[in-house]
Amino acid sequence: MSFTSNFQKQIFIYLVCCFLFTANYSFSQKSEVKADETSKAKKWYDNINIRGYAQIRYNKLFETNSNLGCEQCDKSWGGTNSFFIRRGRIVFSGDVHERVYIYVQPDFASAAGTTNMIFQIRDAYFDLSLDSKKEYRFRFGQSKVPYGFENMQSSQNRLALDRNDALNSAVSNERDLGVFFYWAPKNKRELFSKLVNTGLKGSGDYGIFGIGFYNGQTANRPEANNNQHLAARISY
């Protein structure tokens, strides 16, 4: 009788120990999972992407007219110019919120005239999406004016060395300060991105329909006459 009682006590103690060990192990596992989830939770700045590019030119090759110049065009034309940093840009972009996208692009090779090289902001804007699919969005800040096709293309993707003067002269530097509205279905926005990312010379994601107001003074210049310009664009 005594042997049976002791044996039952031992079995009971063994089962209790197993239960406590299992419960402790399960709690430890859950704590580790929660700790991992906390440590892997992304901050808003983790979504910021940094990239850039530079373009260097030499325009003396096959030159026939050293007096040819164009303040609105390539500043390395004519005169004593030879090697020239046409563009030197760094891009900071990303979704800082589920409905807010930012894009900032400074240019370290901008020319104020025929000689001086200065730092200049090319793009500084944010997109505010009105829906979760980001099909309807407003763009606030300095950005490209939705006008033409070549004007919208990035210099990284364009086939020609420069944009044609006929269209580019309408919006020098392609950019201005304003507010624009863009609309495109989600699948079309994905298509716009695919055309650029696969090297098919797309114009970028400026919506199926775009419309907005801008100062009309070109980039990095304040409003001078309180007379905003209107631009609209439809693509298919």
Task: Set out the residue ranges of the language-model regions.
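Outer membrane beta-barrel
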Residues: A41-F62, W77-G216, A224-A231, S235-Y236
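A general boundary/transition motif marking the beginning of the first structured unit of a protein
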Residues: M1-S5, S169, P222
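N-terminal periplasmic/intermembrane-space "pro-region" immediately following the signal or transit peptide
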Residues: F3, F7, L15, F19-G69, ...
